[in-house]
Amino acid sequence: LYQAVLGRIRAEQDDGDSRIYKISPEGKLGQLSLDHVLGGGRFGKPPLTQYLGIPEESMGLEPTIVPQKAEIGTRYLICSDGITDMLSDGEIADILTREISVSETVELLVERALIKGGRDNITVILCELVEQEKSLFGKLLNYFL
């Protein structure tokens, strides 16, 4: 779902009920993905019914692609609707901005979703961009780019 290429992040998502969020080091939450579920159809129609009467080989939706500049301290959250159906964007942002580790943040997101009812599967992937000492190859690559 995420691909890091030469210091840039490219968010990709296929159709479905999962979301990708970005939270900046300043605490600003943004949804990078589009919802592709009933009622949130990409083309004004639900994703399944928009293909009624179309030959199978002609079907297909392009993934959402959102180029992102990589910034140290940014967190990226990929989560299923087991999280987003239970927690508001504000609740998600509150948890993501806490001064706790990535693993503690994931545990808290899952715990809160379960406390609020957890009716669906709960899947969470969270990454945080951190500064890392560059290898000689990395330094040379930056020199030429």
Please give the residue ranges for each predicted region.
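Conserved subregion of the PPM/PP2C metallophosphatase catalytic domain
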Residues: 1-79, 83-145
